[in-house]
């Protein structure tokens, strides 16, 4: 091309671009011109406060259980049981403002641990510096290194844990003082065989940098966890034999060692350990003088995975403890002592126990919530003796109940109960020890809800994709719903193991309905509350069972005249992003559009602990990994796909999105991408997401 022709081409290019600028700028406000925008703007702010809930806060018993105080409507009130009168005490302190989104204030960053730990007697401080454990006086003086071998070249570290332990085992500490402050236990990690992942950070700055993290992906070598105990006075280090002298191998219990603490008397170091497959879990005690271990409780679930961190609660003697287990196929409660002796089976239910509410040793009673209402979502308060006898349900099974420990009177004669369902707003009552209602304390005010014309959420029952069981979902309607019209449907999804799409908690409709959509959420066979045996349906099949059940939920609505089955979208973040992409790709007959944010796209790409718990390793479950691989279904793409990822996501790496994008490009598919520069594990902006759905499910004829 001659110089003249180049100049002419350049002038034409500039002219063409300048012509496009005004149109492009105007297009930035296109959501404001879309159907439903004004209705959404008008209603979304109103919906949030449309119901004055009939709930009480901060219940506190007074006068040996004769009265109690509570907070409601920014005031403190006192209720007298004998007179059944409520009197105003004064103004309540406003609730503290949250310090921000994400992790609780003061907690380490995602996947990390606290970098220091002060001894119980406040005299000493342990801290991690340059991959080694150090000790000093509490004021920082007289510091010295307990370990010196930790270094970046050898990829070893002390007093810190590998990222995957923090993320998947909730291990936010790596140093543990004994109760008498005489010893400190700590982690040693060897990451020399665990592959590194290079994450590029600061991509919006002049120079970017690389964050290098040992990140073992499914089937890859894991970091090796060891534990040591340092005796302050003796200056002696003892290695804890976390694997009973066995080598670090997949089958060995002790492949993972976590949830570390000292026994209340300080005589033993306690921790949980599992094999790599995570179908065996042992609650273990180590002798701090010798490092030898003994098993207190062993839990096994050969068909799939064992719960890795069962809730436990010590009794007053600090020797006996309440333990929960899924060994029967449903979570139940047991009483053990630290010798490992089973003292009592406290519950034997063919349904799930949810959580322990209160233990009253003097009265010999335990209160807990269980899922034995009219359906598994309706929590009920139970009371049982600490010998396992006289188990009684205290609440009405027609409702879902909430009772906190503070709501039960000191003498156990009464409790404050809040009840609700998906379509009955919460109300609060005073109940006696026999389950009889003593007084109505509060009920929800639905005046504004009704004035706005809001619609109650509908509970849906449908068959799982394989027809094996009933599942539930919820359907949200716009305030101006007209059953004679057809509406596009959005599915809000997460769908990961233990997630619930349906709920018996009262909720106002999803504000996205005001754009002119129906919005639904559906359970899967892996949802919470169905029991361990039911959840096993997803084992080795992530990305198949849950997605097929989402499609089954959508198809259960096809016979409703007001549902436009050809205009169904699905959205979610993280596992929900994965579910969104897979549903669109696996079930093009059910879904027409998907917004997939921060999505795993292949289980080959995710970490060992989470992935292998449900999928085992790809070397021994190739069919399962391939069936859950989004790239396998690229040719199925018929609808519209929006992909979002954060460039600094250290949980679901950008590699996931990149591999999906590459596969789509190679297949010549049309799709959209939104990127969060320097953003971590995050979601797509709601306004951009709704813009995408309106364009593809409403305006695209």
Model-derived regions: residue spans:
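Non-catalytic accessory segments flanking enzyme active sites
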Residues: 55-60, 65-66, 71-76, 86-107, ...
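Short coil/turn segments that connect the beta-strands within blades of beta-propeller domains
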Residues: 65-66, 121-123, 180-182, 265-267, ...
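Alpha/beta-hydrolase-fold serine-hydrolase catalytic core, especially in secreted/extracellular enzymes
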Residues: 73-74, 288-289, 328, 336, ...
